[in-house]
């Protein structure tokens, strides 16, 4: 089953890509918990992390610090949370492994249940800012 992530990876759907290498992609979340909320995903469409070879899990997670640092620099966030859900009972919405990087800000409390829908222009501006922070 082709997911929205597979369509973005294949260039069939637009995505706000902040990082890409041969095997991975990081994109801004279209429905962020807070500004800069991003997703790091393997290009191979594994549904759950338990399906991935250990070395690919290690490669995926090894990208998180560099991507998180760029997000923090670009957004002014002071901290971040990492989340990775497996299965719909764990609230995995898209059946393609992805790691959430959720920036946290000193001056506001972020609610995990309340998401804001930014415009494409806002996402594009933020994408450029993060990409320039690598």
Task: Show the residue positions of the predicted features.
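HIT superfamily nucleotide-processing domains
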Residues: 1-134
